[in-house]
Amino acid sequence: DGTAYFISAARDNADLHVYRLSEDYLNVEKLVHRLWQGEYREAPSVIKSEEKYYMITSFCTGWAPNQGKYAVADSMEGDWGMLKKIGDETTYQSQAAFLLNLNGQLLYIGDRWNAENYFESGYVAYPLKVENGELVMEYCEETDLGKYL
């Protein structure tokens, strides 16, 4: 419907806040959610697929990768429910940067941080799919980005 939202960490990263933006996207109109209070989630990335919204987040561990988790909602202002694990215990050594829906195919783009030489940090790309309402991240050594175009 063209409504834009801004998601940020709040209370020293203890919570995630979801704000609805004004029609021109220049101002916050309303705080619509305080998500997972006290859970210390960061790096929120949202994608819509099959009329559902999926948000992937990570735990606040600085440069160290950790278990990514996701939640599902019927709308950005709806109930996000419980966090569920995605990927392996380190989200395949990454942290969500953004999610893409390219021609109906879902793609996770993650930061792969290098704590000792941050300027050598890079990105990874992993296919995502929805199976029976659950978001699944497919590990692969290489992702052919050409098939998404």
Task: Describe these PLM feature segments.
Residues D1-L149:
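Carbohydrate-active catalytic/glycan-binding domains of CAZyme proteins
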